[in-house]
């Protein structure tokens, strides 16, 4: 299985080129690049007011207002500090780098900008991890978080004194995707037996899990719910960053591997079809050719 990168590599590579050219003393060039990411997220890298030495990176998330309710603005201020500027029109967050004042740790700055999407997502997880570590449960100053991270797909997060439960709803666009999704989730459950530190993973098809009872969660033949039960060892200060890195990408991870599995199956089917055609071609009998003569002595060939 392949782990998807949590950063946006195109954003990082674009900014790296800008910094390296500036360090080398090359003339600054204008930039206007739009980059797509998972979950309908868009990045926009551009200059401010035509100043080629000022490079602004903006991010647009359709669900950012929901993240703001869980401390997204505060987390970004903590992570980006003076890099934050007023958001560009049509975007939720913007950061600015000055190519005339390059910091010594510019590579770390590039890395942090590439993690903008991850850090926006992190706010809701950190909030509920803190609730759990403080021994607070639902009804004790907090309620379940509901993040509509994609059209018709939702993430739910709630804390109990002994665990944090994260539920992803997802839509399978094809009947085959449901089958492959079930197989994939079964493999995850089997893999947990080999690792006693892995979180509990549950999958429900058509019906939402009990955690979402009476919430109006969607029901349907193409609806699936993936539930993670995170225990204190997953939400502790020293491990929570890795937990967030892995869990916020899970929906994309699942569908990526479903598509890879379908592509592999199709390639195997095409390979088998090619082999069968070769066998049939070898088994085809050669046509019989008979040479005969007429009464006048002319020769003709008859193919049977």
UniProtKB/Swiss-Prot annotation:
Molecular function (GO) terms listed? Answer: actin filament binding; structural constituent of cytoskeleton
Q: Where is the protein found, in the record's own terms?
A: Cytoplasm, Cytoskeleton
**Which controlled-vocabulary keywords does the entry list?**
Actin-binding, Cytoplasm, Cytoskeleton
Give an example GO cellular component term for this record. Answer: Arp2/3 protein complex
Q: Which GO terms describe its biological process?
A: actin filament polymerization; Arp2/3 complex-mediated actin nucleation
List the Pfam families hit by this protein, alphabetically: P34-Arc
What role does this protein play?
Answer: Functions as actin-binding component of the Arp2/3 complex which is involved in regulation of actin polymerization and together with an activating nucleation-promoting factor (NPF) mediates the formation of branched actin networks. Seems to contact the mother actin filament.
Q: How does it assemble?
A: Component of the Arp2/3 complex.
The record's comment on protein family reads: Belongs to the ARPC2 family.
According to UniProt, the name of this protein is: Probable actin-related protein 2/3 complex subunit 2
Q: Report which gene this protein is encoded by.
A: Arc-p34
């Amino acid at each position: 299985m392949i782990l998807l990168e949590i950063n946006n590599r195109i954003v990082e590579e674009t900014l790296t080129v800008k910094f390296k050219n500036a360090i080398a003393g090359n003339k600054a060039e204008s930039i206007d690049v739009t980059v797509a990411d998972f979950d309908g997220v868009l990045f926009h890298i551009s200059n401010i007011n035509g100043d080629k030495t000022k490079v602004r990176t903006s991010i647009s998330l359709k669900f950012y207002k929901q993240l703001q309710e869980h401390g997204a603005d505060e987390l970004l201020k903590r992570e980006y500090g003076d890099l934050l500027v007023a958001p560009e029109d049509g975007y939720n967050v913007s950061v600015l780098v000055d190519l005339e004042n390059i910091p010594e740790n510019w590579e770390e700055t590039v890395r942090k900008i590439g993690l903008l999407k991850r850090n926006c997502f992190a706010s809701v997880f950190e909030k509920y991890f803190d609730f759990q570590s403080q021994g607070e449960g639902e009804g004790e100053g907090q309620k379940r978080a509901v993040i509509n991270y994609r059209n018709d797909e939702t993430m739910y997060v709630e804390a109990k004194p002994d665990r944090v439960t994260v539920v992803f709803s997802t839509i399978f666009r094809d009947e085959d995707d449901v089958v492959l999704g079930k197989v994939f989730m079964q493999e995850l459950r089997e893999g947990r037996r080999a690792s006693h530190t892995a979180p509990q993973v549950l999958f429900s098809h058509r019906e939402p899990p009990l955690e979402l009872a009476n919430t109006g969660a969607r029901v349907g033949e193409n609806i699936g719910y993936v539930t993670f039960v995170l225990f204190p060892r997953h939400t502790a200060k020293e491990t929570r960053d890795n937990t967030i890195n892995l869990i916020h990408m899970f929906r994309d991870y699942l569908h990526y591997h479903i598509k890879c599995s379908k592509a592999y199956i199709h390639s195997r089917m095409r390979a088998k079809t090619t082999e069968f055609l070769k066998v049939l071609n070898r088994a085809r009998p050669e046509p019989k050719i008979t040479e005969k003569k007429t009464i006048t002595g002319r020769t003709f060939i008859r193919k049977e």
